[in-house]
Amino acid sequence: MNLVPALVLLLALAQTVLGATIGHDKVQPFAQPDPVTVSEKAAVKYKPQLQISDSCVSFPAVNAAGEITGGLKGTKGTDGCTEAPLGSQVYGRSTWYQDKWAMMFAWYFPKNFWGGGAKSRHLWANMVLWIDNPALETPKILGASLSRQTLEVPKAVFLSMGEQQKDPYSKVTAIPPMGFVGMQAIQTSRISRFRYTYNYTGGSDISTRVSQGYPDNSAWISLTFAGTDGEYQDLIMWNQLTDQARAALESADFGEDTKVPFNDKNFEAALAQAWPF
């Protein structure tokens, strides 16, 4: 047996399984397929918008061949990540969890941010939207869970610069009015010097909007509900990915501090952490 071709083949297979790393701006996103199943139709119907103001835009993390993004070094602010030249991507996965239907929508960012500045390579963020039944004509939104980072807050000369988050999700059982796409707040009256009452008008009751933002000035960037509209990205569900892409997302190493939340290894645990009821 000729060992050279055999070794070449083994190396090629290993590369396919583990996923080769390519430039963050060279990853071709998946086009959003026409939804066929009940779960796919519900995910498309409830797909959220992502609004970006203080960080990188979202980028695709893997292509059809299983090649994984290399991300960007956590320096120089948003240099190199203000636009995804080949298009962005939102990843999805759905399942029954206890007695609720859970839809996870996840975004990948090539840099992570703290206190307004880039700090490290790679970030995954996700939202879990909980509904009663995807087979209904108009399922009821029961709650939402938005991921946030639990990393240690940097210190300045032995002084903490903020509070470290303990729970990896912020959770609500009612979406705030301004969390819906198109919603506008109309000021109606003044209660006190800094307090007003509002009416809310013009918004969706299905599509939500989230943003990458800071809970305070000394915090790691996390998902929050947005006050203004963002953009939709092409949605690709876990079972719509190619075998190579799924295998790559199972084995890819994005670092100890951020994990692919919707792969087989992490999905169930993420839903347990996101449970808001």
From Swiss-Prot:
Its main location: secreted. Disulfide bonds: none annotated. Glycans are attached at residue 199. It is found in: Secreted. GO terms for cellular component: extracellular region. Keywords: Glycoprotein, Secreted, Signal, Virulence. Residues 1-19 form the signal peptide. A motif (Hepta-peptide GHRHDWE motif) lies at residues 119-125. Belongs to the Necrosis inducing protein (NPP1) family. Key residues/motif important for the effector activities are degenerated in most NLPs, including the nlp24 peptide consisting of the conserved region I (11-aa immunogenic part) and conserved region II (the heptapeptide GHRHDWE motif) that is important for phytotoxic activity. Secreted effector that contributes strongly to virulence during infection by P.capsici. Induces cell death in the Solanaceae, including hot pepper. This is NLP effector protein Pc109174. It comes from Phytophthora capsici.
